[in-house]
Amino acid sequence: MVRLTLDLIAKKSNLKPRKEETTLQYLKKITHINFSAKNIDAIEDLSLCKNLSVLYLYDNCISQITNLNYATNLTHLYLQNNCISCIENLGSLKKLEKLYLGGNYIAVIEGLEGLEGLRELHVESQRLPLGEKLLFDPRTLHSLAKSLSILNISNNNIDDVRDLEILENLNQLIAVDNQLLHVKDLECLLNKLMKLWKMDLNRNPVCLKPKYRDRLILVSKSLEFLDGKEIKNMERQFLMNWKASKDAKKISKKRNSKNEDISNSHRRISL
């Protein structure tokens, strides 16, 4: 196994120092570090890399997120396909915009309080014990309520997404290969997520429910793509007209029934 150290970065970086440049000056200059698929199992103190903005550490053996407190300029962090079981030590990354944590061992989405600039969170395909599902800490969801725009929670045995209603600026939700079952729950979610324009729920049990697609299109005016298929204006208008006609018939039937009851009541009185 390999530890990510300053020496390793200095040796392997694509950015080569000038002759007159000291190691310290060189490390301060680095903005991108890519050590994906290098058998990295731990992150050492990299605090000299003051200007680091993008860190690629996917496809490694990292079990704990450590020594990133210094990286206050970090905007993109790629940690997918490691051995991480807990989201921690990220509170100081105030500029972080994109966080990739798919393919780890994370059971609870937590520890993201204070990351008010986070726009994308990718936590798909966690390697959970059989029968367990990915959970969301309400404090983390509350912290991300205004910033998060893209969320990928695919393949995590999730059967309820109502907790996500708080994410008011979410515009893309990818939740394929889960256990979502109830159309009503999705209707409630879409009623809250007024900016959502793309939702992918392929290979969930709910997709097999009657009128599943029609009901979701009717409840959301912002949705443009559902399960990878574009929602055409003609399709939405047809469904709206159909619903209006159906509602009108219901009202008419109710009114006729009420009038009939009144008529029968008058007839009984006259008798």
Walk through the language-model features, giving the residues of each.
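The feature captures the LRR N-terminal capping module
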Residues: 1-85, 94-150, 191, 195-200, ...
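Structured C-terminal portions of repeat-based eukaryotic scaffold domains
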Residues: 142-203
